[in-house]
Amino acid sequence: MEQEQDTPWILSTGHISTQKGEGGQQTPKLEHHNSTRLMDHCQKTMNQVVMPKQIVYWKQWLSLRNPILVFLKTRVLRQWRLFSKHEWTN
């Protein structure tokens, strides 16, 4: 049970209410400093999650060009072999 007390969502005793902003739009209003800590924790966690995803997307994007290059290389090699074979037999 003591380990659970270290997590921000267990420590948060405040609650989020809404306040009217400009244009009558309701926005969340944090009423406890632990709620602010929870929001900061969530933001940091999201940032840690987003970065590896961006790296994965870049790797996928970079690997997209490789199959195309491999396809072109094999196609050219096949045509070259066919051409060479054809020249050899004639």
UniProtKB/Swiss-Prot annotation:
UniProt keyword Membrane, yes or no: yes
Per the UniProt record, the site (Low pathogenicity) maps to: N66
Do you know which Pfam families this protein is assigned to?
PB1-F2 (PF11986)
The entry's cellular-component GO terms read: host cell cytosol; host cell mitochondrial inner membrane; host cell nucleus; membrane
Region of interest: Mitochondrial targeting sequence: 65-87
Q: What is its main location?
A: host cell
* Chain segments carrying region Disordered: 1-30
What HAMAP family does this protein map onto?
INFV_PB1F2
Name under which the protein is recorded:
Protein PB1-F2
What is the species listed in this Swiss-Prot or TrEMBL entry? Answer: Influenza A virus (strain A/Hickox/1940 H1N1)
Task: Tell me what gene encodes this.
Answer: PB1
